[in-house]
């Protein structure tokens, strides 16, 4: 796996001229309102990844935000709801269009309740994914080799997962339902950031 480490932004978008990009984020915690964005990792789907450290207080990353805002490029996430929130909060850009492998897994793999990335990669792709660095200091000025490798590993499998999950969704007749869910995600994220994360506003009571 080829990993390129950057600070502040992608140097250019020459590697991202395809129709889909895999994206993940690392933050100081799991509250998108409280915890700042520290790292954005992206992969063009060729087995390589760019890991971008985001300085504290940064609100601009021109090349990265251009990619996020490009409506012709599909953004593949795992648990997009969280990543969209932290990216929107940091840069003011809501990435679209979106594909979420976690939502796709929940719709296609109803025989299991294991929809985490590690479980998904193991079953669907037959590979092991280490999660040892999941809870670590992503705001550190210098990331360890283990952190960088962990961040990259979280995105290099997403293109392949999408392909396999698409087959399962089609087999179960849930392709259109998945697409509807993906299109709704930006609005779900705006509700989260407006303070409605723990409330089902569609419920009767």
What are these regions (language model features)?
Residues 1-205:
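DEDD superfamily 3′-5′ metal-dependent exonuclease/proofreading module
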């Amino acid at each position: 796996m080829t990993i390129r480490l950057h600070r502040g932004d992608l140097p250019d978008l020459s590697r991202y001229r395809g129709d889909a990009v895999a994206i993940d984020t690392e933050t100081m915690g799991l509250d998108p309102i409280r915890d700042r964005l520290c790292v954005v990792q992206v992969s063009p789907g060729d087995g390589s990844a760019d890991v971008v450290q985001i300085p504290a207080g940064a609100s601009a990353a021109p090349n990265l935000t251009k990619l996020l805002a490009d409506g012709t490029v599909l953004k593949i996430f795992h648990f997009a709801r969280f990543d969209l929130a932290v990216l929107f909060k940091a840069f003011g850009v809501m990435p679209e269009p979106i594909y979420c492998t976690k939502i796709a897994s929940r719709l296609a793999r109803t025989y299991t309740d294991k929809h985490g990335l590690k479980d998904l990669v193991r079953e669907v792709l037959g590979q092991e994914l280490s999660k040892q660095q999941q809870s670590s200091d992503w705001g550190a000025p210098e990331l360890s080799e283990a952190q960088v490798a962990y961040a990259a590993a979280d995105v290099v499998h997403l293109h392949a997962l999408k392909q396999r999950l698409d087959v399962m969704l089609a087999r179960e007749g849930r392709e259109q339902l998945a697409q509807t869910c993906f299109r709704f995600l930006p609005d779900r994220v705006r509700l989260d950031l407006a303070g409605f994360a723990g409330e089902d506003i569609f419920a009767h009571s």
